[in-house]
Amino acid sequence: MKSARHLGLLLLVPVVLLAGCAKQSPGPAASAPPAKHVHHPPHGGTPVVLGEEIYHVELVLDAATGKLSAYILDGEMENFIRLAMPAFDMTAQVNGQSKVLTFHAVANPATGETVGDSSLFETQAEWLKTTRTFDAVIPGLAIRGTTFTGVTFNFPGGNDRD
């Protein structure tokens, strides 16, 4: 009986040793960098972030006509945000000169938007037909009780740093 107990212990020792030497399963993978928070402008334009991504302005250029459209969108660029203001300004630096663009609200009977209750603003300038890149600032834009001032960006690069 003693030899049977010793034999059992002898058989158990290699099993324990083998288990201890077994290949360790890898621990949790090193934490990957967080996924980049990306917004996709619905019209394929330039995203301009307002505040800490509270809202966006999407700028879309029609170079053939020199028309620049500004869509006001929520923080995820999924929903249009209507503004009470009839117009807002943007100052662009073009070849060392300041060029002020005034965006005017666009009424849209299909959506019920009117001047003073619109998410689309447009401007037009001859120089937009030939200029493809510029730095700009929106001096002030009021959205739902919050005023964003001194919003700087590059066109067409935008200012989203995520």
Model-derived segments and their meaning:
Residues 1-20:
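Sec-dependent bacterial lipoprotein signal peptides
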